[in-house]
């Protein structure tokens, strides 16, 4: 078997494969495109610290808190989480082949042919945990190519200081958009633009809210629809930082502009000059390498089945963890366990 991806979902799946009696290297291999441990966390912007991150859940069998120390709140997540993942790989003897770029996965009778830049693997089963970081999404708007300023995606963001003295248009209604809007607005002027009116959640996040959100996303993927985001169901939490930003007048949202001009953006009733457009418009699942398997259904998504909707309906040898309802870190752990259990049972191997 092959596990592609060594982020939260991939490491969880590898842990449970080993727990179910499958030995690494002889029974399964883990391939990861990054040069070091940490999944997408290693690429996050430095100001995203453990005090501002939306939550890092424990991998099975090892506490994250035990690896961070007592004064970890201001440690960048891009440092703390990769350190945790590195210790985890060593603790549970989960060798990860890296960097390995998976080019394509093709059906070959009873096996899957997995072609990479480091060679070819033949696998009876596949757990795909490639996440979304490699597929940033930027919607197309008329005039985008004429803009004389800078356009960048959340993935490219490093620090607010580089925008000092420039007017920044922040596009997007998710958690990252709100966090970066707040951060940038402390050093320069901003305009916030979203496609829909953001929904804020004043009440505390409860397990029931989380379960309801996951259930709605799970229903979509079981019906073969594109997953949608969990935050679109849960709403945005009103943190002290957001309250302070409201008081500073930063959270006054405008609807989406209709056109991008060389020096700004345009609505039907006016324009705003801009030096920078920051697209906090999310990511799409990194699944292009699976295209030869023809997994997508007529609904535009991949119809999923299994206990936690990790098994691909069109090919039970393939599980997607970190897709749809398992895209959160806590969901990824449960999905990794379910995928490992169901795949080994389907193949008739392991304990």
Where are these regions (language model features)?
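Flavin (primarily FAD) cofactor-binding/catalytic cores of flavoenzymes
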Residues: 1-35, 39-42, 47, 73-351
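Redox-cofactor-proximal catalytic regions of oxidoreductases
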Residues: 36-64
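A short acidic, helix-capping loop that chelates divalent metal ions and anchors anionic groups
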Residues: 66-71
